[in-house]
Structure formats: structure tokens, C-alpha cells
A protein has these predicted regions:
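Central helical "cap/lid" subdomain
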Residues: 168-219, 346
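Dinucleotide-binding Rossmann-like beta1-alpha1 core, especially the glycine-rich loop
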Residues: 24-103, 227-229, 263
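C-terminal lid/capping helical subdomain adjacent to the catalytic/cofactor pocket in oxidative enzymes
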Residues: 94, 313-349
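Glycine-rich FAD pyrophosphate-binding loop
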Residues: 2-21
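Glycine-rich phosphate/pyrophosphate-binding beta-alpha loops
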Residues: 26, 32, 121-126, 225-227, ...
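A short coil-to-beta-strand element that immediately follows conserved catalytic motifs
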Residues: 60-62, 196-202, 283-295
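Active-site lid/adjacent beta-loop-alpha segment flanking the redox-cofactor pocket in flavoenzymes
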Residues: 211-317
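Helical element adjacent to the flavin cofactor pocket in flavoenzyme catalytic cores
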Residues: 116-175
């Protein structure tokens, strides 16, 4: 689109087959950081643009979201989101217990002190979204090569020269963007560059189908007091929980394919046992709820919770896009645009 020259995308696996395939993909619009809201809005704009360009639907599920507060601390957080949403023009309203129960048939509404409903929030299938990005990029002239693992970034005299693939093939380029997610630092270490993030396990559980109790496309929820989120899933309920001590991983132990990596799945019931009591006041039978599936994967968390996007000072032509802090699907469109503008020397949006 920006006439930036020849662009090549290299993916070590099939597109959308790794971390993005293990995400809940909540496109939450309201954030306490204004810049992050801009990035998320750009993703929504990208989805609309891609659908128009390809003349096909990416099946965005405009289900809305409900943020729930049941303590003084979570109420302050809710109020901050409410203020941010109003400032950014995002539709929102506080709803009472009766309306909460109507929208969320599974919830114990008496546990809800305050509920903030944002009807334009959505979720999306990451495979469809990533496939949409790829198809649109190809249509606009980008060359895509999947199953091409990058072995090293080539530099000479503090300037990027390209990359070398695992096959030994050298690909020359004056600009290299390291967007390798959890694997990004493996490519940076030989260059004596460290990106300030750590791969941390994120996970969720999916219940058995009960379409009456968990109707399709009911609003997803964010429940800070339970360190939890929920999302509909074809008649089941996705339950995401954050344990008190999150498990991080040495990136050098990561396998080339995440399906071959052990995210300590043996601990999934231990984690559920630890976190379930916090959610029980909202989902009373969580102890007995049939669980059909468990999903885990890495999220790249940064100490200051800010994304790592832009040029690497040590090497001319080297850029990075990583450290998405669990928000890569939601903010991906904005992250891509910001990276492109920085590479081209344009004023960031």
C-alpha cells in the first residue's frame, strides 16, 4: 500500500499455526493507555479493509463485553476503563443485575456489584484473521513463504544485510523486522541484543456444550476479582484464569512447533483448583462443570506492559515487533501499521 518496495514474509511454520492459534482473541476496545486504544481500533479498521479488499467475511463476532467489579480495587479499574471509553467515543453503559443475567445466563448476578457493558467489543477466529492478513498482503504484492525457518540475522559493520534460513539460503535485505514472538530473542542473542520480554504461559479451559446456559455469541466477560475472563465457544464456555504465580519459560527450551512443547499441562488441574474458588461466586458449579478441552500457549510479557516496536539502535535496518503482552491479536493491525510507519520514516499515527 505504501509502495515500500519488495516485501518478503518468512514464517517458520504455517501462518497462524503457533501462538496466535492458542489465543482467546478478545478484541477489547477500551484500555487505560490511549495509544493502545488507537492500536486496537486500527485492527478493527484493518478487518473492515481486508473484508472489502478480498470480498469475504472474516467472521468478526460482535458480541459485546461486560467488565465486572465486586471490590473497591476492581471498581477503580472499571471506572478508569469507563472514562477511557467515553473519552475515545466507545459505546458503553452500566447495567443492572437483571440485564447482566439476561446477557449472561450462567452467572450468579448477586455477586456482581457493578457491570460495564460495551456492546461493540468483539472476538474473532485467529486463523481467519491471520489468513485474511496474509491474503490481503499477497494481493497487494507481498511475497509469503511459510515453513521457512530463519536461522540468523545477517549483519556487517553494524548494518543489516538480510537473513540466513535453516536450509542455508541467504536472503538479502536492507531492512529486517524480527516479529518472531516468543522465539525473537533467539535471533537477537548472537547480535548481543536483548528484547525485554519473557514467554509466560497463558491458558484457558473450555466446558462441554450447554447451548442454553452458554448461548453462542453472548458477551465475553472480564472479571478482575477472579483473575478471569470468559468467552462463548459454540455452546460451550471458555474460561481463562491467571494463577497467582505465572509460569515463565526459558526461550531456549522452546521447540520449533508449540504442539511439541510441554507447557506443564500436568499442572492444569492444580491451576484450576487454585483459581476456581475466586470464580465460584460468579460460576457456582465450576467445581463440577464438565471440561472438554484445555489450551495453553506462550504470551510475551514486558515489565512495563508496553509493546516492543521499532528500530534496534545497535544495527541500521533492524527492527522488531514483539512483546505483545497477551494483546497481539487485538492490537496486531495497529502494531503492523506503526512498524511500517517507523521503517518508512513517517510520522506515526
Amino acid at each position: 500500500k505504501r509502495h515500500a518496495g519488495n516485501i518478503l514474509l518468512l514464517d517458520g511454520n504455517e501462518i497462524a499455526s503457533q501462538a496466535s492459534a492458542r489465543a482467546a482473541c478478545l478484541l477489547t476496545r477500551a484500555r487505560t493507555k490511549p495509544a493502545l486504544m488507537e492500536l486496537v481500533q486500527e485492527t478493527y479498521d484493518c478487518i473492515e479493509e481486508i473484508e472489502s479488499l478480498l470480498d469475504e467475511s472474516l467472521e468478526l463476532q460482535m458480541c459485546g463485553s461486560i467488565t465486572i467489579a465486586s471490590s473497591e480495587a476492581s471498581l477503580k479499574g472499571l471506572e478508569a476503563l469507563e472514562e477511557a471509553a467515553c473519552r475515545f467515543g466507545i459505546p458503553n453503559e452500566r447495567i443492572g443485575k437483571e440485564r447482566v443475567k439476561e446477557l449472561l445466563p450462567w452467572i450468579e448476578e448477586e455477586a456482581v456489584d457493578v457491570a460495564l457493558y460495551m456492546p461493540t467489543d468483539a472476538f474473532i477466529d485467529s486463523a481467519l484473521l491471520c489468513s485474511g492478513y496474509a491474503k490481503a498482503a499477497r494481493k497487494l504484492g507481498v511475497t509469503l513463504r511459510s515453513n521457512c525457518k530463519v536461522k540468523e540475522i545477517l549483519v556487517e559493520d553494524a548494518e543489516v544485510k538480510g537473513v540466513r534460513l535453516a536450509t542455508g539460503e541467504a536472503v538479502t535485505a536492507p531492512v529486517v523486522v524480527n516479529a518472531a514472538g516468543s522465539w525473537a530473542n533467539l535471533l537477537m542473542r548472537p547480535l548481543k541484543v536483548g528484547l525485554p520480554f519473557t514467554p509466560v504461559r497463558s491458558h484457558f479451559w473450555i466446558t462441554s456444550i450447554d447451548a442454553t446456559r452458554f448461548p453462542a455469541n453472548h458477551p465475553f466477560t472480564i472479571i478482575p476479582d477472579a483473575r478471569a475472563f470468559t468467552r462463548s465457544d459454540v455452546g460451550g464456555l471458555i474460561i481463562g484464569l491467571r494463577e497467582s504465580q505465572c509460569q515463565s519459560f526459558d526461550l531456549s527450551t522452546l521447540t520449533e512447533k508449540l504442539e511439541d512443547f510441554d507447557f506443564n499441562k500436568a499442572a492444569k488441574w492444580t491451576v484450576l483448583d487454585e483459581c476456581a474458588p475466586l470464580l465460584k461466586k460468579y460460576l457456582k458449579d465450576i467445581d463440577d462443570l464438565p471440561i472438554a478441552h484445555y489450551m495453553s500457549g506462550p504470551s510475551c510479557y514486558v515489565p512495563d506492559a508496553k509493546f516492543i516496536i521499532g528500530p534496534v539502535a545497535r544495527y541500521k535496518g533492524l527492527h522488531t515487533v514483539t512483546g505483545c503482552c497477551g494483546g497481539g491479536v487485538a492490537a496486531g493491525g495497529g502494531m503492523g501499521r506503526l512498524a511500517a510507519e517507523l521503517i518508512l520514516g513517517e510520522t506515526p499515527f
